Amino acid sequence: MIRRVRVTVRVSRACRPHHVRIFVAKIVQALCRASASINQGTPFQVLLIVRKKRHRGRSGHDDGQCTPGSNPVAVRGGTQHPRPDNPHPASPRRCPGGLPGHSDAAPSGRGAAGCQGLLGSPACGPRRGTRTPPRGRIPARGGEGRLNDTVQEAQ
């Protein structure tokens, strides 16, 4: 059985006032009780129809959001670092010489860092064993601690 349903939709948007749309939708509905589980999909069918009819003329605007202007959002094609005070050049993240601003970095591709499952970029932090100790503490490594002990014994 085809059932005609009157659907009233109140569309709320971030940058425009609410507006109401009313239309008639045709929904196929099961007649027998054995296939009553098909009838539970009726709200889902209504939502699909509402989404299709909401912005029929405009493609890509089916989630209720809108851009500040009337033009669709342009593809990001500007430089990666638009600020003038940024020390890194405006180049792709990985270029043939490695990471921008790091001449001793691994060449493009995953390299040894990729084999370990790490990104290998400076954002991951310094490599193991290169961190500076916290202020006011002497690092507890083998050679440095013994050096301080021998200096105290000699005095």
Curated annotation (Swiss-Prot):
<dbReference type="GO" id="GO:0005654">
    <property type="term" value="C:nucleoplasm"/>
</dbReference>
<dbReference type="GO" id="GO:0006915">
    <property type="term" value="P:apoptotic process"/>
</dbReference>
<dbReference type="GO" id="GO:0008285">
    <property type="term" value="P:negative regulation of cell population proliferation"/>
</dbReference>
<dbReference type="GO" id="GO:0070534">
    <property type="term" value="P:protein K63-linked ubiquitination"/>
</dbReference>
<keyword id="KW-0053">Apoptosis</keyword>
<keyword id="KW-0238">DNA-binding</keyword>
<dbReference type="GO" id="GO:0043065">
    <property type="term" value="P:positive regulation of apoptotic process"/>
</dbReference>
<feature type="compositionally biased region" description="Low complexity">
    <location>
        <begin position="125"/>
        <end position="141"/>
    </location>
</feature>
<keyword id="KW-0698">rRNA processing</keyword>
<dbReference type="InterPro" id="IPR010868">
    <property type="entry name" value="Tumor_suppres_ARF"/>
</dbReference>
<keyword id="KW-0539">Nucleus</keyword>
<feature type="region of interest" description="Disordered">
    <location>
        <begin position="55"/>
        <end position="155"/>
    </location>
</feature>
<keyword id="KW-0832">Ubl conjugation</keyword>
<keyword id="KW-0804">Transcription</keyword>
<keyword id="KW-0805">Transcription regulation</keyword>
<dbReference type="GO" id="GO:0005730">
    <property type="term" value="C:nucleolus"/>
</dbReference>
<feature type="region of interest" description="Interaction with CDK5RAP3 and MDM2">
    <location>
        <begin position="1"/>
        <end position="59"/>
    </location>
</feature>
<dbReference type="GO" id="GO:0003677">
    <property type="term" value="F:DNA binding"/>
</dbReference>
<dbReference type="GO" id="GO:0000209">
    <property type="term" value="P:protein polyubiquitination"/>
</dbReference>
<keyword id="KW-0833">Ubl conjugation pathway</keyword>
<comment type="function">
    <text>Capable of inducing cell cycle arrest in G1 and G2 phases. Acts as a tumor suppressor. Binds to MDM2 and blocks its nucleocytoplasmic shuttling by sequestering it in the nucleolus. This inhibits the oncogenic action of MDM2 by blocking MDM2-induced degradation of p53 and enhancing p53-dependent transactivation and apoptosis. Also induces G2 arrest and apoptosis in a p53-independent manner by preventing the activation of cyclin B1/CDC2 complexes. Binds to BCL6 and down-regulates BCL6-induced transcriptional repression.</text>
</comment>
<dbReference type="Pfam" id="PF07392">
    <property type="entry name" value="P19Arf_N"/>
</dbReference>
<keyword id="KW-0131">Cell cycle</keyword>
<protein>
    <recommendedName>
        <fullName>Tumor suppressor ARF</fullName>
    </recommendedName>
</protein>
<dbReference type="GO" id="GO:0006364">
    <property type="term" value="P:rRNA processing"/>
</dbReference>
<comment type="subunit">
    <text>Does not interact with cyclins, CDK1, CDK2, CDK4, CDK5 or CDK6. Binds to BCL6, E2F1, HUWE1, MDM2, MYC, NPM1/B23, TOP1/TOPOI and UBE2I/UBC9. Interacts with TBRG1 and COMMD1. Interacts with CDKN2AIP and E4F1. Interacts with CDK5RAP3 and MDM2; form a ternary complex involved in regulation of p53/TP53. Interacts with NOP53; the interaction is direct and promotes ARF nucleoplasmic relocalization and ubiquitin-mediated proteasomal degradation. Interacts with TTF1 (via the N-terminal region (NRD) and a C-terminal region); the interaction is direct and inhibits the nucleolar localization of TTF1.</text>
</comment>
<keyword id="KW-0043">Tumor suppressor</keyword>
<dbReference type="GO" id="GO:0051726">
    <property type="term" value="P:regulation of cell cycle"/>
</dbReference>
